[in-house]
C-alpha cells in the first residue's frame, strides 16, 4: 500500500491540530467545576464521565496525521493513569501547553533538540523541587481530603476510602464493585478469605444462613487429593480426643473419604468440614503455605516427605473461628507467629517488585493483604446504570490517588504546587539560548493546569494566576468557593506522585513531538467509481 508523507511545518501543524482536538475535549473536565463529557456507546445508555483518560481513550480522528498527534497525547494520559491512577487531565493540559509553545519556537527557527534538552532539564529540576515541597500523608483526615478532591469534591467517597484504609491498612486490598442499593457502602472482610466453599451441604452447622461455623478448630492442609479414608483416620482420632472441630483444606476430597466425613459429622462423632484448596498449580501451593503461615500449621505434602498417616496435632493449624458458605471460606484470627507472618508478607512484596505481569502483581497483592489483615470492598450505590458507571470511575480514581498520596506524600492542590515550582526555577539556564527557550516553555506550561481550573469555573484565568503568583507557600485559589487562602488548610491537596507523573509523562511525549520532522501514514483508499448503467436490450429501456 502506498504511503502519504508530510515534512516540517506541514506535519507539525497537522499533529498540533490532533493534539488540540483531544486536549480540548479532555481539559473541560478539570477541577471541581469541570464539565461532564457524554460518550455514545454502540449498545446501552451513553456514558457520562469527568475522567480524563476515559474521554481520551474514546477519541479517534478521521485525518490520520491529526490522529497520530491525538494518539500520542492519549498515551500521556494512559501512562499517567498506569503510574499514579489519577492526574490524567492535568497531564494532558501540560502536554498541550508544552507542545503548542514548543512548536511556535521551532517555527521561529529554534533548534528542536536544544528545546528538548531545555525542557528535560526543567522537568528534572521541577521533580526535585516537588519532592522538597511534599508533606507526608498518613492520617485519616489527609486521606479523606485527597479522596474527596480526586472524586470531584465528593466528600462521601473520600470518607469511605479513608475508613477502608483504616480497616485494612494503607497497603491493604481495597476493591470497588457495583452495589445493589442507592447508598455507597463499605464491606470489610476480616481475616483470610478465599473463594472455595464446603464440598457437601451436609457439613452445614447453621441451616438458616447456610453456613458452617467452626469455633477454635484445627486445620489440616494437604497438597493432594484425598480419596482413601485410611489416610485421614489418625488425624480424625486425634482431633476427636481433643474435642475440637476440624477443617480439611485439600486439592480435593472425594469418594469414600468424603462420604465417611459426612457420616461422622452427621452422627456427631467429630465436627468436620472439607473444602478445596484455592488456586491452581504453583499458586495453590503458595496459597496453602500462606494459610499454614497464618494458622501456625504445616502443609502435608509428599514433595517434602510428609505422610498423612503420620500427622500429629502439632502439624495442624489453628484459628479462633472459621465461617464457610457454599462459595467462600473465611479464617478469622489464625494463631500463626506474627514474626513469621511478617516475614512471609515481606517475601511476597519482593515477588511483587520482581514481577513483570500486572495479573501476577494483582494476585500477589491480594495474598499479601489477606495475610496482613483483610480485604475491603467498596460497593458503589446509584439510582441509574449511567450514574453507577460515572460514580464507579470516580471512586477508582480517588482510590488510586489516595494510594499515591500515602506513597509519596502530598502538595498544595489546584495547580498551586507547579506554580510555586516554576517560581523557584525562574533563574534556571541552559547551555545556549535555544535551551533557555525550552526552559521557559516548560516553566510557562506549569501554570496551565491552574489556568484551566479557573477557566472551567468561568473566572478570568490571568487575574487569578497573577494573584496566586504573588502569594507564597500554599497560598492559592479555591475553585469551589472562589476564595483565596492556604490550600492545605482548605483541604485542597494533590498527591505528589500524581503531580510528578503528570509533569514527567507530559514533558516526555511533548519533547518527542517537538523534535518530529516527518510523519508517514497509509494513503486513504479512494472509493471505487460507481458502475455505469447497463444498456437496455432490444425493445427494453436501460436497467435502473
Curated annotation (Swiss-Prot):
E.C. number(s) listed in UniProt: 5.6.1.7
Gene Ontology cellular-component annotations: cytoplasm
Keyword Transcription: no
Keyword ATP-binding belongs to the record: yes
Domain of life: Bacteria
Keywords from the UniProt entry: ATP-binding, Chaperone, Cytoplasm, Isomerase, Nucleotide-binding
A GO biological process held by the record: protein refolding
GO molecular function terms attached to this record: ATP binding; ATP-dependent protein folding chaperone; isomerase activity; unfolded protein binding
CDD domains: GroEL (cd03344)
Family: Belongs to the chaperonin (HSP60) family.
HAMAP family: CH60 (MF_00600)
Record protein name field: Chaperonin GroEL 2
Source organism: Psychromonas ingrahamii (strain DSM 17664 / CCUG 51855 / 37)
Gene, per the UniProt record: groEL2
